[in-house]
Amino acid sequence: MRILIPTLSRNGAESVASPHFGRAPYLALVETDLKGNIASIEFFAGEGPHEDHRSEKDATEARSIHSRVTDLKPDVIVASMMGPRAVSDFSASGIKLVSAQGRTVSEIISSVNSGLITKLEPHRE
């Protein structure tokens, strides 16, 4: 399974998850094996404008990061908060959006494997 998690750092499985997808400096793409163990972790730039856009240029840049994420082909995105535009874009691409318990990538993967997930709803500020 390919699981995307927004993070505050690039410290492998011990990377701390970012509380908000749109403000995360990094995105960790975690590949798990059939038993749910972490097989690999790859990090990508996650900085993108927040979903509350002031101009068409900002909206275009947001679509760009959404396209980059979609191109990574994650099966699931695990986040605590995500704006309505991102929820709409990723859901339309068939990506499952959930929140899970845990502070680090490894803790979140354990929660996903244990089924301790909930459907992610759009965050509105």
Q: What does each model-identified segment do?
A:
Residues 60-98:
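Mid-chain, well-packed structural core segment of small domains
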Residues 1-60, 64, 71, 97-125:
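Non-catalytic interface/targeting segments
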